[in-house]
Amino acid sequence: MSKVKKNEEALSEVLVDVNRVTKVVKGGRRFAFSAYVVVGDKAGRVGAGHGKAKEVNEARGKAKQAAKKRMMKVPLYQNRTIHHDVVGKSGAAKVILRRAKAGTGVIAGGSMRAIFDSLGVHDIVAKSIGSTNVYAMISATFDALNKLASPKSIAIRRDKKVHEISIKSYIQVNE
């Protein structure tokens, strides 16, 4: 009996960054390519990965495989935004994610937009502070997404019922 593969066709792939890197050796320079890819199913799962190879397509393939391995599930509110405001940090990069009303759209810059599009978020406001390095911003965004919790998971953790958890008690901005 063969293993059932996950539906890979449903994953969207966004190439966030490609760099040509150089290694200086005795005989001259060796060139390679580095790629950073974000993949997601547009339904609450997203991952990011880095790959390096002598050709761009190989680097992109390695990055996609790494992103699939690092996929994570993010709780979404009404399948369109996040449950509460959250702050993520990575090095000198700081990212603030805020929930938004329906119809607001994705207000985010650069690599954060790629993450939210792959995640399936339709309404969010995001602000990056500090470093605008692609790797740092993506890492900070994933740090913020890891801090998200649904009211159901908070209720389970506190050994309460969902209706006992008020909105104010689980909305917090970690500064």
Swiss-Prot record:
One of its GO terms (biological process) is translation. GO terms for molecular function: rRNA binding; structural constituent of ribosome. Pfam families: Ribosomal_S5, Ribosomal_S5_C. Gene3D superfamilies: 3.30.160.20, 3.30.230.10. PROSITE patterns: RIBOSOMAL_S5 (PS00585), S5_DSRBD (PS50881). InterPro entries: Ribosomal_Su5_D2-typ_SF (IPR020568), Ribosomal_uS5 (IPR000851), Ribosomal_uS5_bac-type (IPR005712), Ribosomal_uS5_C (IPR005324), Ribosomal_uS5_N (IPR013810), Ribosomal_uS5_N_CS (IPR018192), Ribsml_uS5_D2-typ_fold_subgr (IPR014721). One of its GO terms (cellular component) is small ribosomal subunit. Keywords: Ribonucleoprotein, Ribosomal protein, RNA-binding, rRNA-binding. Residues 11-74 form the S5 DRBM domain. It comes from the Bacteria. Belongs to the universal ribosomal protein uS5 family. HAMAP family: Ribosomal_uS5_B. With S4 and S12 plays an important role in translational accuracy. The N-terminal domain interacts with the head of the 30S subunit; the C-terminal domain interacts with the body and contacts protein S4. The interaction surface between S4 and S5 is involved in control of translational fidelity. Part of the 30S ribosomal subunit. Contacts proteins S4 and S8. This is Small ribosomal subunit protein uS5.
